[in-house]
Amino acid sequence: MADEATRAAFMEIQASMIELTGKLKQVQNQMRNKEGDRKRAFLTLEELRPLPEETNTYKSIGRTFVLEPKTVLEGEQEQKLKDSEAAVASLQTSKEYLEKQVAEVENNLRELLQQEPGIAQQIMSMSM
């Protein structure tokens, strides 16, 4: 009876660990993407700023280019930069929360294995 309860607890902890790890990887990928967007916007702004105001600038829309004033493009890039920074900050808090959750689940698993050393042997025999 206790063995079944221990096994069920292990399976539950394992499922939550898999779920949390997947969510953490997803957040890390989203952070990487937003960081890339932020860098692109920053570099584009760095290239636009030294140009004279009367310079013809073009915005890419699909496969076409549309003539836009320099100030409009600068404004769009500044907005992209701000949005990306805000998204990265939000994702960072999510990442920290998920990392705490993963650590908590790891501690729960460690406690379970210390309380029931026999379950570790059963798990190892199941995986082989």
Curated annotation (Swiss-Prot):
Entry GO terms, CC: cytosol; mitochondrion; nucleus; prefoldin complex
Keywords: Chaperone, Coiled coil, Cytoplasm, Nucleus
Coiled-coil residue windows: 17-37, 81-115
GO molecular function, one term: unfolded protein binding
GO biological process, one term: protein folding
InterPro entries cross-referenced by the UniProt entry: PFD_beta-like (IPR002777), Prefoldin (IPR009053)
Protein induction: Accumulates in response to cold.
Pfam families, per database record: Prefoldin_2
CDD domains (alphabetical): Prefoldin_1 (cd23164)
First-listed, main subcellular location of the protein, grouped into a coarse class: cytoplasm
Subcellular localization(s) per the UniProt record: Cytoplasm; Nucleus
Subunit field text: Heterohexamer of two PFD-alpha type and four PFD-beta type subunits forming prefoldin co-chaperone complex. Interacts with LSM8, a specific subunit of the LSM2-8 complex, which is a core component of the spliceosome.
Family of this protein: Belongs to the prefoldin subunit beta family.
Known role: Binds specifically to cytosolic chaperonin (c-CPN) and transfers target proteins to it. Binds to nascent polypeptide chain and promotes folding in an environment in which there are many competing pathways for nonnative proteins. Together with other chaperonins, contribute to the regulation of gene expression by modulating the spliceosome function on pre-mRNA splicing post-transcriptionally by acting as a co-chaperone of Hsp90 to control levels of LSM8. Required for microtubules (MTs) organization and dynamicity.
Protein name per Swiss-Prot or TrEMBL: Prefoldin subunit 1
Organism encoding this protein: Arabidopsis thaliana (Mouse-ear cress)
Lineage of origin: Eukaryota, Viridiplantae, Streptophyta, Embryophyta, Tracheophyta
